[in-house]
């Protein structure tokens, strides 16, 4: 007993003499305790959502009622292939408890993902549920609208990406704080509870390309900030400081040479007889009983608004400008029955310290993909369509991020006109309205 007491008494001296080891093992102990705390908290969250989901599964229905069929399309490469494991923990059990029929299909590559998204229809499922991040969403939306004029199924999204920028823009109150699994569970509950919203895709075409147009819901971006955010992943060993270190390290090595481009854009219009075609109304089919009931009524199957008589003199008006900066961002803004384009270019004449300063502000507020300072963007306008031609793009940032999918390093991006336009291509999506569980 005296030996044990003696060792305890010498412990402070031992720790003092081995400062480096003490600091190292203390840090490991902190990380271990934090992991245990987060694991226990997430287990409790999953349990509470399971209690809600099982109530739907225990609801009495007719034997003839077919269960809701969900076709789960998984990008196995999403977020270093970790998103599928998280889906299995957070969303799949809720579907099973709610009595939902689930079919899971894994796509091995982007081409397969696009093909499957375009092929699935009401014969196989009632709902398409996509597991992946921003790039996966862009690929799925492209697959749907390259193969069909209209989407056949409503779509749900599991936030399996590294940043999930589009979901954060659509519903920041749910997806901005992703320290726990509540936001992931809510996406499954939105499908179970049939919480739907209509969104509209953008269309992107490239001059001289033989490929069909690309479609997406998120944004198109390029620049120093986007490149630095992309490289931060390799600094994982800096843990919570990896973003700040990425900004400091990249600006220590090189200065932010500007992007230069020429922009042509078309004035935005909420709808007029010039830009909105008159709705196509199919002639009704006659049946013998119409002799007794009268002439059948014409029906607008799409429920489209008729803009005949509405005149907007600025509709289709085109403008041109030359702009330059450290970051440009093109966002798909959702309107009532269409989407429009928001073009922003910022960081004009910004230096190394300016990039670090603005980057640190983004880190402090947990924002990725855009500046927290609205004055940062010297060029900012809304348009029906935007056509831009990049004349200067530094070699280190020679990439265009389309729905967070980066173009290859050897892609021809300069002196080629790229056109992005808002569309009326509608997609019904499942989106939670709020986080129901308070911690």
From Swiss-Prot:
Disulfide bonds: none annotated. It comes from the Eukaryota. It holds the Pfam family DAGK_cat. Residues 65-208 form the DAGKc domain. GO terms for biological process: ceramide biosynthetic process; sphingosine biosynthetic process. GO terms for molecular function: acylglycerol kinase activity; ATP-dependent diacylglycerol kinase activity; ceramide kinase activity; D-erythro-sphingosine kinase activity. InterPro entries: ATP-NAD_kinase_N, Diacylglycerol_kinase_cat_dom, Lipid_Phosphate_FormReg, NAD/diacylglycerol_kinase_sf. One of its GO terms (cellular component) is membrane. This is Uncharacterized protein F52C9.3. It comes from Caenorhabditis elegans. The lineage of its organism: Eukaryota, Metazoa, Ecdysozoa, Nematoda, Chromadorea.
């Amino acid at each position: 007993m005296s030996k044990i007491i003696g060792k305890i008494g010498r412990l402070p001296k031992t720790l003092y003499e081995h400062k480096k080891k003490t600091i190292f093992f203390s840090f490991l102990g902190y990380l271990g305790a934090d992991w245990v705390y987060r694991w226990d908290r997430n287990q409790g969250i999953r349990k509470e959502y399971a209690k809600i989901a099982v109530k739907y599964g225990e609801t009495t229905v007719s034997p003839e009622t077919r269960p809701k069929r969900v076709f789960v399309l998984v990008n196995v490469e999403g977020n270093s292939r970790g998103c599928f494991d998280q889906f299995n923990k957070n969303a799949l059990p809720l579907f099973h408890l709610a009595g939902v029929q689930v079919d899971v299909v894994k796509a091995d590559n982007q081409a397969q993902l696009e093909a499957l998204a375009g092929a699935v229809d009401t014969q196989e499922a009632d709902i398409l549920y996509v597991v992946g991040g921003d790039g996966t969403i862009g690929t799925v939306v492209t697959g749907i609208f390259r193969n069909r004029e209209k989407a056949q199924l409503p779509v749900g999204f599991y936030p399996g990406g590294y940043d999930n920028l589009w979901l954060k823009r659509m519903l920041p109150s749910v997806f901005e704080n992703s320290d726990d699994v509540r936001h992931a569970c809510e996406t499954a509950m939105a499908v179970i509870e049939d919480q739907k919203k209509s969104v509209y895709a953008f269309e992107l075409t490239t001059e001289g390309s033989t490929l069909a147009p690309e479609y997406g819901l998120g944004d198109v971006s390029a620049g120093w900030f986007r490149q630095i955010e992309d490289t931060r992943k390799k600094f994982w060993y800096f843990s919570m400081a990896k973003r700040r270190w990425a900004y400091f390290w990249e600006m220590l090595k090189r200065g932010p040479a500007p992007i230069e481009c020429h922009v042509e854009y078309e004035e935005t219009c909420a709808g007029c007889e010039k830009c909105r075609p008159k709705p196509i109304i199919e002639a009704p089919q006659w049946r013998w009983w119409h002799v007794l009931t009268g002439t059948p009524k014409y029906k607008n199957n799409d429920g489209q608004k008729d803009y005949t008589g509405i005149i907007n003199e600025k509709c289709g008006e085109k403008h041109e400008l030359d702009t330059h900066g450290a970051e440009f961002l093109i966002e798909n803004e959702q309107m009532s029955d269409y989407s429009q384009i928001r073009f922003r270019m910022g960081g004009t004449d910004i230096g190394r310290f300016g990039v670090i300063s603005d980057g640190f502000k983004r880190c402090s507020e947990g924002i990725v993909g855009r500046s927290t300072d609205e004055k940062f963007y010297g060029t900012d306008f809304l348009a029906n369509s935007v056509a831009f031609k990049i004349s200067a793009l530094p070699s280190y940032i020679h990439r265009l991020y389309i729905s967070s999918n980066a173009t290859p390093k050897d892609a021809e991006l300069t002196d080629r006109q790229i056109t992005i336009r808002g569309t009326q291509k509608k997609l019904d999506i499942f989106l939670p309205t709020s986080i129901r569980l308070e911690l």
